[in-house]
Amino acid sequence: MIAALRGNIFEKDGGKILLDVNNVIYELNVSMITFSSVNDKGLFYITEIIKENEYTLYGFADKNEKKLFDSLIKLNGVGPKVALAICSTYTPQTFMDIIANHDINALKKIPGIGPKSAKRILMEMGEFEVVFEEQNPVFNQALSALESLGFNKNDIVKALNGIKSDNLEETIKLALKKLSKDIK
C-alpha cells in the first residue's frame, strides 16, 4: 500500500498530475484544490483504488482532504468521481460545516449531485466520524474538555467544526450552545 509519494511534477493536465518519483512516473487523480496548490514539487497523500481491471491512484496535498475523500467513498452511491468533485468544490472544513448545517443547496451545487444524492449524503455523513487534524491547539483542548463532560466525540467534532476562535473558554461555550441545541 502506498501511503504518500514525494516527487517532481512531470506534467499537470485536467485534474491529473504526473509525478516523477526517482524516474518512475505515477499518474495521480487530484482535486482541483490540490491541482492548483502544487507547483514544481509535491508531497501527495495517496488513496489507492483497485478494481478488477483498473488500478487508480488519488493524490491529495492535504491530509484532511484525503480523510474526507476516504470517508466519502464509503458512502452508498458515492464513488471516487463524485468524491473528487466534492473535494474540488469545497475544502474539508467547509464541507463538514455544510453537513453540520444540513445545507442541501450547497451540496446540490457539486457536479454530479442532485437532490436525492444530496439528502443521502447529508444523512450518511452525519453518521460518520471524520476527525480532521486541526492546526489549532484550542480545538484539541476543547475536544478533551467536552469529552470529560460526557459528550460523544462525534457530536463534539460536529459542534467544533466552524468555530473560529483561539480562546479556549469561548470555543467551549460556543460548542456547548451547539451541543445543547442538539439535545433539545
Swiss-Prot record:
<dbReference type="GO" id="GO:0006281">
    <property type="term" value="P:DNA repair"/>
</dbReference>
<dbReference type="Pfam" id="PF07499">
    <property type="entry name" value="RuvA_C"/>
</dbReference>
<dbReference type="InterPro" id="IPR011114">
    <property type="entry name" value="RuvA_C"/>
</dbReference>
<feature type="region of interest" description="Domain II">
    <location>
        <begin position="62"/>
        <end position="135"/>
    </location>
</feature>
<comment type="subunit">
    <text>Homotetramer. Forms an RuvA(8)-RuvB(12)-Holliday junction (HJ) complex. HJ DNA is sandwiched between 2 RuvA tetramers; dsDNA enters through RuvA and exits via RuvB. An RuvB hexamer assembles on each DNA strand where it exits the tetramer. Each RuvB hexamer is contacted by two RuvA subunits (via domain III) on 2 adjacent RuvB subunits; this complex drives branch migration. In the full resolvosome a probable DNA-RuvA(4)-RuvB(12)-RuvC(2) complex forms which resolves the HJ.</text>
</comment>
<dbReference type="GO" id="GO:0006310">
    <property type="term" value="P:DNA recombination"/>
</dbReference>
<feature type="region of interest" description="Domain I">
    <location>
        <begin position="1"/>
        <end position="61"/>
    </location>
</feature>
<keyword id="KW-0238">DNA-binding</keyword>
<dbReference type="InterPro" id="IPR000085">
    <property type="entry name" value="RuvA"/>
</dbReference>
<feature type="region of interest" description="Domain III">
    <location>
        <begin position="135"/>
        <end position="184"/>
    </location>
</feature>
<dbReference type="Pfam" id="PF01330">
    <property type="entry name" value="RuvA_N"/>
</dbReference>
<keyword id="KW-0233">DNA recombination</keyword>
<dbReference type="InterPro" id="IPR013849">
    <property type="entry name" value="DNA_helicase_Holl-junc_RuvA_I"/>
</dbReference>
<dbReference type="InterPro" id="IPR036267">
    <property type="entry name" value="RuvA_C_sf"/>
</dbReference>
<dbReference type="GO" id="GO:0000400">
    <property type="term" value="F:four-way junction DNA binding"/>
</dbReference>
<keyword id="KW-0227">DNA damage</keyword>
<protein>
    <recommendedName>
        <fullName>Holliday junction branch migration complex subunit RuvA</fullName>
    </recommendedName>
</protein>
<dbReference type="Pfam" id="PF14520">
    <property type="entry name" value="HHH_5"/>
</dbReference>
<dbReference type="GO" id="GO:0005737">
    <property type="term" value="C:cytoplasm"/>
</dbReference>
<dbReference type="InterPro" id="IPR012340">
    <property type="entry name" value="NA-bd_OB-fold"/>
</dbReference>
<dbReference type="InterPro" id="IPR010994">
    <property type="entry name" value="RuvA_2-like"/>
</dbReference>
<keyword id="KW-0234">DNA repair</keyword>
<dbReference type="GO" id="GO:0009379">
    <property type="term" value="C:Holliday junction helicase complex"/>
</dbReference>
<dbReference type="InterPro" id="IPR003583">
    <property type="entry name" value="Hlx-hairpin-Hlx_DNA-bd_motif"/>
</dbReference>
<dbReference type="GO" id="GO:0009378">
    <property type="term" value="F:four-way junction helicase activity"/>
</dbReference>
<dbReference type="GO" id="GO:0005524">
    <property type="term" value="F:ATP binding"/>
</dbReference>
<feature type="region of interest" description="Flexible linker">
    <location>
        <position position="135"/>
    </location>
</feature>
<comment type="function">
    <text>The RuvA-RuvB-RuvC complex processes Holliday junction (HJ) DNA during genetic recombination and DNA repair, while the RuvA-RuvB complex plays an important role in the rescue of blocked DNA replication forks via replication fork reversal (RFR). RuvA specifically binds to HJ cruciform DNA, conferring on it an open structure. The RuvB hexamer acts as an ATP-dependent pump, pulling dsDNA into and through the RuvAB complex. HJ branch migration allows RuvC to scan DNA until it finds its consensus sequence, where it cleaves and resolves the cruciform DNA.</text>
</comment>
<dbReference type="GO" id="GO:0048476">
    <property type="term" value="C:Holliday junction resolvase complex"/>
</dbReference>
<keyword id="KW-0963">Cytoplasm</keyword>
<comment type="similarity">
    <text>Belongs to the RuvA family.</text>
</comment>
